[in-house]
Regions:
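Active-site environment of divalent metal-dependent phosphoester hydrolases
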Residues: 10-15, 39-41, 65-68, 107, ...
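Beta-strand-turn-beta hairpins that frame and shape the catalytic cleft
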Residues: 1-4, 107-114, 178-183
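Anionic-ligand binding region
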Residues: 134-174, 180-184
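Acidic, His/Gly-rich catalytic cores of divalent-metal-dependent hydrolytic chemistry
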Residues: 162-245
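N-terminal active-site segment of His-dependent metallophosphoesterases
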Residues: 1-56, 229
């Protein structure tokens, strides 16, 4: 089975549309979204509509949780709070109800894949996995994570290989899974990459070949940025799209 996995769209319709168009060449059998459909960008409803139509299952991200009243975001910085408040006012009843019902994780038993937005440890706290020491916390739940655990949240592409007693960070490039290891993979961001590559990030996992692939695609950043400004959101949310941070 060829699985398309993407995350952190952040209301960037132009990036999401480019990713879904690129996926058409990948012979994808099923799609999964790892959360944060909303937040930061100018097209929350349009992106929610597309994700609902495309993904078999979508995971709850922290911005999704904030917009839908499922977490306290009073500690977020002012511009981020403003965007979340604006999106809450913009979302249709259907899309708001959808966000309210999203799960924190999903285990795909048939392919031994765990899906979450952030770390699988303390799911409701949406913790990051940037480095091996953070991935090492997952060793305590070795029997509960998948052969591969796919996450978003950091907006970075990261790969960590785990044994029951050791964690190693691998290069963020295509790789084949080894049977005696487990993997935590951060799939990057569709709508707001933060690795100084402004192209939208998306991934493919071939569960038959046990092969994971990272993909990037260019999109109309100028239009996406213009929509941020027209929505009267923070100017930096538009500017950062051009530099990929």
């Amino acid at each position: 089975m060829r699985i398309g996995i993407f995350s952190d769209i952040h209301a960037n319709l132009e990036a999401l549309s480019a990713v879904l168009e690129a996926y058409k060449t990948e012979s994808i059998d099923v799609y999964y979204c790892l959360g944060d459909t909303v937040g930061y960008g100018g097209s929350p409803n349009e992106c929610a509509d597309l994700v609902r139509e495309t993904a078999k299952k979508t995971i709850l991200g922290n911005h999704d949780a904030a917009v839908s009243g499922r977490m306290d975001y009073s500690y977020y910085y002012e511009a981020a709070r403003h965007a979340l408040d604006a999106h809450a006012a913009m979302l249709s009843e259907t899309n708001m109800a959808w966000l309210k019902a999203l799960p924190y994780q999903e285990m795909l038993e048939e392919v031994n894949v765990l899906l979450c937005h952030g770390s699988p440890v303390r799911l409701e706290e949406f913790e990051y996995i940037f480095a091996p020491e953070q991935a090492r916390e997952c060793l305590s739940m070795w029997d509960k994570i998948g052969h591969i655990t796919l996450i978003g949240h950091s907006h970075l592409c990261k790969v960590f290989a785990l044994t029951p007693s050791h964690v190693e960070e691998l290069p963020s490039m295509d790789f084949d899974l080894e049977p005696d290891k487990k993997y935590i993979v951060s799939v990057g961001s569709v709508g707001q990459p933060r690795d100084f590559d402004n192209r939208a990030s998306y991934t493919v996992y071939d569960s038959d070949k046990k092969r994971f692939e990272f993909k990037r695609i260019e999109y109309d950043i100028e239009l996406a940025a213009d929509k941020v400004l027209r929505a009267r959101l923070e100017r930096n949310f538009a500017h950062r799209l051009f530099i990929g941070v």
